[in-house]
Amino acid sequence: MITRPIILVILCYAILMIVQSFVPKAVALKRKPDVGGFMVEDQRTHKSHNYMMKRARNDVLGDKENVRPNPYYTEPFDPDTSPEELSALIVDYANMIRNDVILLDNSVETRTRKRGNIQVENQAIPDPPCTCKYKKEIEDLGENSVPRFIETRNCNKTQQPTCRPPYICKESLYSITILKRRETKSQESLEIPNELKYRWVAESHPVSVACLCTRDYQLRYNNN
C-alpha cells in the first residue's frame, strides 16, 4: 500500500515539472531583442523603428556555403527594398537636427517646435537712403606709363543735397597695376615678367571707380 509521504513527493514532482515547462515561454516573452542599440524613436509617433535588417536563421544555416559564425549577419541596406524604413529614418534624422541646438559653450540644448512654424525674414539688401552724383574725369599718367589715360569717377567734395547726415557720399577706390618706363636701376617694382623688368617697373595706382552713399561714422564719433 502506497504511503502518504510517497504520494506527496510524486505530487510535488509533477507540479515542479509543470512549472519548468512554462518558465522558458515566459522568459522568451519578456526578453527584449538584442538589437536595442539600433532602435530609433520616432519623435512624432513615439514609436521605435528597427533599422537593422536581419536574415532568417534558416536561410543562413541551411546553405553550407553561407555558414557564418554570426547568425545575424547583415547585408548592405537597399533603399528600394524598404522605402518606408528609409523615409522614417530621414524624418527622424531631420528631427534630431531640428531639436539639437549647439550653443556657444559647445553644450547641446534640446528644443521643440511645431512643424511649419518657421518665419523667414526678408534678407533683401535695402535701397540706399540717398543718391550720389559723380563727375567723370580722364587722368593722364604721363607718356612713360602704360596705360597712359584712365577714366575716374570722382565725388563732389562738398555735402550733396540728396545725401543728408548721417550719410555721406564717398569714393570707392580700386587699385590697378600700371607699367612705367624704368628711369634708374634702383627703382622698386612689383613682380613682372623677366622680359619687361629691364625697361619697365610695375606700380600700384588707386583709381576712383564709383561714388557710394555710406554712413558717416566719423561724424557719429565726433558727436559722442
UniProtKB/Swiss-Prot annotation:
Glycan-carrying positions: N156
Q: Name one GO biological process term.
A: neuropeptide signaling pathway
Which is one GO molecular function term here? hormone activity
Q: Where does the signal sequence lie? A: 1-29
Q: Which InterPro entries match?
A: Cystine-knot_cytokine (IPR029034), Insect_Hormone_Regulators (IPR052876)
Functional summary from the UniProt entry:
PTTH is a brain secretory polypeptide of insects which stimulates the prothoracic glands to produce and release ecdysone, the steroid essential to insect development.
Describe tissue expression.
PTTH is synthesized by two dorsolateral neurosecretory cells of the Bombyx brain.
Name assigned to this protein: Prothoracicotropic hormone
> Which cysteine pairs are covalently linked by disulfides here?
C132-C169, C155-C211, C163-C213
Which keywords label this protein? Cleavage on pair of basic residues, Disulfide bond, Glycoprotein, Hormone, Neuropeptide, Signal
